[in-house]
Amino acid sequence: MLRRLVQQWSVAVFLLSYSVPSCGRSVEGPGRRLKRAVSEHQLLHDKGKSIQDLRRRFFLHHLIAEIHTAEIRATSEVSPNSKPAANTKNHAVRFGSDDEGRYLTQETNKVEPYKEQPLKTPGKKKKGKPGKRKEQEKKKRRTRSAWPLSAGAGSGLAGDHLSDISEPEPELDSRRH
């Protein structure tokens, strides 16, 4: 009976020690440990990507700075009034591996550093100034304004045209109402 009591106590102590959290961890420790490992792995992956991106940016910045200083050195050696050599041309320079297929042009005679152009905001097109019209439009307007004057029956005097304009015809009057 004593032997059986010892076995029961040992089983009870074993179960209690296994299920009681050690060092403040809960019962489901292995499951949380796996989740934490996955999130930690993803964090390290993202950190590695950001470090790689930072290295790439630093490399490109350093490369551009070398090109810029090379341009400054080349222009400082040349006198300010001299013309550039006739055989200098803009040649295509390849960066990166052959499978990228990206070509960047190098302007050898350029003195100013590169400045990004501001993006154009889409908007309405600007209209021309209202005071400036093309000659053809002016002629068309003149001929249109001359039609009612020449079409009126009369002696051609200015008084006749004024009487035509001041007294509306019955057909035109019916259209207005």
UniProtKB/Swiss-Prot annotation:
Q: Where is the composition biased (Basic residues)?
A: 122-132
Which positions are listed as propeptide? 25-34
Q: Where is this region: Disordered?
A: 74-177
- Keywords for this entry? Calcium, Cleavage on pair of basic residues, Cytoplasm, Hormone, Nucleus, Secreted, Signal
Q: How is it modified after translation?
A: There are several secretory forms, including osteostatin, arising from endoproteolytic cleavage of the initial translation product. Each of these secretory forms is believed to have one or more of its own receptors that mediates the normal paracrine, autocrine and endocrine actions.
GO CC aspect terms: cytoplasm; extracellular region; nucleus
Q: Chief localization class?
A: secreted
Extent of Basic and acidic residues compositional bias: 109-118
Q: Where is this region: Important for receptor binding?
A: 57-68
> Any keyword Nucleus?
yes
- Family from the record: Belongs to the parathyroid hormone family.
**Whom does it interact with, and what assembly results?**
PTHrP interacts with PTH1R (via N-terminal extracellular domain).
Q: Give the protein name, as stated in the record.
A: Parathyroid hormone-related protein
According to its UniProt entry, this protein's organism is: Oryctolagus cuniculus
